C-alpha cells in the first residue's frame, strides 16, 4: 500500500477504471460526449487507497512514466510524456486518451516563453501543436501532442488571424528540429508510439496579441482535423470544441454535415500553392476526397441504455471499449400514494402558467417537459400522462403580482377540470390522484420569496409535490427560452419527485456496504439569530434521511420540530427520544421493502457536531441509539448490525503543502490511525480538487465517533467505509448541483432547511396522514 502523503510515484502503478460521476446527456451530442469523457478521466483512475489524478500531473516530471491500467479485466499501457497532461479524444468511434502540453501546471509561464526556453528560437509569428493518434493492440488509442520545430504558415484568413500548423512523421524525423524531440527523452519510446503511419493533423487558427503572445481567438469554434495517411491528407471532422455558440452549433451537426465541412476546408488547403510546395518537399500531397478507410469513422460513440438492467453501454462499430460502467437513470417501480398503496408512473399531473406569458409559451413548455420526462421513464413512458394547462390570472401591478391567491384559484380550476374525468370521486380522492404540479412563477428571484413559500406551504400540506419554475426573461417583446441544461435539471427533479430514481451512486459490488446497508443522515437547521429579541430562542428543525434499498436511490424522510428551551431543561431527553423515533421508523420502512429482513450495516452521518460536542453526542444519542437497535434486532431474531456513526465537519483548518513541488491527488487522506474508533475516533479528509501549492478549497473532515466493530484503520472494512463515503459524496449520477457532503447528508440538510424556513415548522411528516406519501419522495429539493 502506497503512503498517501509521500511524493509522486516513479514506479508502475496498478489502477482500476471506475466511473464516479456521470451526467445525463444527449448521446448524439459531441459536446456532451466530451464532457462525459472528461468526467471519466478526471476521477476514474483509483489506486488501492486513493485517487490517481493523472490530469493534475501526479508523476515525476523528470522521467517518462508508463502505467498499466485495467479496463474490464484487460490491461492496457497508458504512456505519459513528462510535462504533458491527459485529455480525451475519439478515433474510429472509440474512446481515447489525448495528451496536451501541461504548461500551466508545470510552470507559470506562457506557452510561448516555455517553448522558447525549451527549444530555442521558434517561428517569429506562429505557434502550433500537432495531435498524433496511434492505435495500440487494436484496442486503445494513445494520443500525443508534440511541439515541432517546422512551422508552416498558411494565410487562409483575413486580418490578424492566420492558420498555423505543423506535422510529424517517423519517415522524416531527421528533418524535424531535434530540440522538439528531446522532450520525449528516448528514441525507443518514440518508435513505440509511431507504430502506424496514420496521423491526425490539427489545424488551429491563432493570432498574435499586442504583447507578442500567440493565442487562439475566442470566436474560433473548433479545429478541423486532417488525416495524413500514405502521403495523402483527407478531412476527418471536428477535433476540439469550445463552449461558445458556434461550437455548440457544430457539435449538433450530423456526421455527413461535419464531413462536408471538413472536405470544404481541405479543398481550401489544396488550393494553396505555397502550402503544397512546402509539404511537397516532405513527400505529402493533398486530396479533397475522404479516404476510403473503414476504420476511420466521422461520428461519436453511441450510448446504449438498457432500461431493464439499468446499465449504459458505450458502443462503437467494433463492439465497444467501455462496457457496463455507467448506471442509467432507470425507472422507479414504487412510490407511496396517500392510500399507502404502491403506484407506478405519473398519470395525473398539471402545469400552471401565468396567462400573460401566452399560449405559445405554455404549449411549448408542456411539450418539452412531457417529452423529457417520458424519456427518463423508459419503458414506463406510457404511464406518464398528458398534463393539462391551467392558466393563472396574475395582476399587472407589481405589488399584486407576487400573491399566492391566484395560484390557489388555479388549483380550484384544476380540481374542476379533473371532476369531469372522475365524476364519482370525492374531492379528497381527486387530490390524492395528483402526483405533481409544475408551477411557473414570475421573477426575479429576489422578489418571489414569499410567493414561493406560500405555494410550497399550500400544496405540501395537501400532500401534493410541486416543481416551481421561474418565468423566462423577455427581450424585445419576446420571451427568451430556457437553457437546455436548466430544462434537463428541472425534468430530472420532476421525475425524482414523482418517485423515479434519477440519482444513483456508483459503488463496487465487492464493497461490503453495497449490500444490506441502510444509510442515515441527521441535520439540524437553526434559523438566523433574531436581532433585538435576546429573550427568544429560535425554533430548530431536525431532518432525518434514510435509505431502504440496496442502491441507495430511494429515501425515506422524517422531520421533527425541536422545542425551544433556553435553559436546556430536558434537552438531552429530547435528543435521545428524537434519534430513537427516527431509527425505529427507518427500520420499519426497511423491513417493509426488504422481505422483513433488517440491514447488516447501518451508517449514520451527522453534521454540525464540533469536537467539543462529540463526547456529549456519544453519551446522549449514540448509547441510547445502540440499545434501541439491539432491542429491534433481538425482536427480529437477527444478530446486531454493524453500526457506524460518522461526523462530517465542513469547517476544516487543516492545510496541506505539495511535496517537492508536485501535486497531491484529489481524493481522501487518512489523518489519524486510531485502533479504537469508539474511544478516540479515526479521521480521514476528503478534498474534491487536487492540492497544488498549499491549500485545497473546502476540505471535508470525517471523524468516526462510533464503530460497533472497532475496526482499525488498516482493516479492509475501514477502507471500504472510506470508499462508501467517497461514492456518496462525489459519485452520484446526474445530480445537477455540486456535492461535497455525502448525498444523504446533503438531502437531510435540504429537508431540515425546507421544513424550517419554507414550511415554517408545520406538522411533523411522520405524524401527519395527509402528507404521508411525501416521505418517500424528495419533495424538498
Curated annotation (Swiss-Prot):
Disruption phenotype: Inhibited cell growth due to inhibition of translation initiation. A change from single to multiple VSP expression in individual parasites. Pfam families: Piwi. Residues 110-194 form the PAZ domain. Keywords: Cytoplasm, Developmental protein, Differentiation, RNA-binding, RNA-mediated gene silencing, Translation regulation. GO terms for biological process: cell differentiation; regulation of translation; regulatory ncRNA-mediated gene silencing. The keyword Cytoplasm applies. PROSITE patterns: PAZ, PIWI. The keyword Mitochondrion does not apply. It is found in: Cytoplasm. Residues 436-760 form the Piwi domain. Belongs to the argonaute family. Ago subfamily. PAZ domain is absent, but Ago is capable of binding small RNAs in the same way as the other Argonaute proteins. Interacts with miR2. Highly specific binding to the mRNA m7G-cap. May be a component of the RNA-induced silencing complex (RISC), a sequence-specific, multicomponent nuclease that destroys or silences messenger RNAs homologous to the silencing trigger. Plays an essential role in growth and, with Dicer, also involved in microRNA (miRNA)-mediated translational repression. The RNA interference pathway is implicated in antigenic variation having a role in regulation of variant-specific surface protein (VSP)-coding gene expression. Several VSP genes are transcribed but only transcripts encoding the VSP to be expressed accumulate. Antisense RNAs corresponding to the silenced VSP genes are detected. This is Protein argonaute. The gene is Ago.
